[in-house]
């Protein structure tokens, strides 16, 4: 793992969290219980404080940063998709930020809300509970349905289960030279296939 102290502040990581060895945590970063931090994520607490609350996930290639005297927060069971950028914002409890979305300074995403992939949430945006946000700039298009929230929660549970699976079996290795016969497939713990 790449952990760096900065001006006397050392990242805090709960022992039940999983932080991928290629992720980087710098300075004023607080990671809660059961959190998943994916490969190549960068949590740079060299200006403001970064808080990832219990059960949340920060996926591959995400960036968290913020200005001085600000907190960038991902609430409990928050779900931050691959490549998303969070800068000085607050992501509410049980909310999802889609892949490659950008959430700017002072923005607040309401709890149980979903930000669609590749959306841009402007600085100072104030969301409400259970909104579906999309676009550039993002706007609320409707409420999140019960089915969508259920799907989001199943996906978040997959990442919560992945924490234990990674602690139990993830390790560095050398590649095989060819695919073995009858190669098994990995199985998730729940069916999260999107319904069409």
Swiss-Prot record:
Signal peptide span: none
Pfam families: Hexapep (PF00132)
Any GO BP annotation: carnitine metabolic process
SUPFAM superfamilies in the cross-refs: Trimeric LpxA-like enzymes (SSF51161)
Biased segments, Polar residues type: 187-196
Chain segments carrying region Disordered: 173-196
Entry keyword Transferase: yes
Pathway linked to the protein: Amine and polyamine metabolism; carnitine metabolism
Keywords: Repeat, Transferase
GO MF term set: transferase activity
Job of this protein: Overproduction of CaiE stimulates the activity of CaiB and CaiD.
Classification via PANTHER family: DYNACTIN SUBUNIT P25 (PTHR13061), GAMMA CARBONIC ANHYDRASE-LIKE 1, MITOCHONDRIAL-RELATED (PTHR13061:SF29)
Protein name (database record): Carnitine operon protein CaiE
Source organism: Escherichia coli O7:K1 (strain IAI39 / ExPEC)
Taxonomy of the source species: Bacteria, Pseudomonadati, Pseudomonadota, Gammaproteobacteria, Enterobacterales
């Amino acid at each position: 793992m790449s952990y760096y102290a900065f001006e006397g502040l050392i990242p805090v990581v709960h022992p039940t969290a999983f932080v991928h060895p290629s992720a980087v945590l710098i300075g004023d970063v607080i990671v809660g219980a059961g959190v998943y931090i994916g490969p190549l994520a960068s949590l740079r607490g060299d200006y403001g404080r970064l808080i990832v609350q219990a059960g949340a996930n920060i996926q591959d290639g995400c960036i968290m940063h913020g200005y001085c005297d600000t907190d960038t927060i991902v609430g409990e069971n928050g779900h931050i998709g691959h490549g998303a950028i969070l800068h000085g914002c607050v992501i509410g409890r049980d909310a999802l930020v889609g892949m490659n979305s950008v959430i700017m300074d002072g923005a607040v995403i309401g709890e149980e809300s979903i930000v669609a992939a590749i959306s841009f949430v402007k600085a100072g945006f104030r969301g409400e509970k259970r909104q579906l946000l999309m676009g550039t700039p993002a706007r609320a298009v409707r409420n999140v349905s019960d089915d969508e929230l259920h799907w989001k929660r199943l996906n978040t549970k997959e990442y919560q289960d992945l924490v234990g699976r990674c602690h139990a079996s993830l390790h560095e290795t050398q590649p095989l030279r060819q695919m073995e016969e009858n190669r098994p497939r990995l199985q998730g713990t729940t069916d999260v296939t999107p319904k069409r």
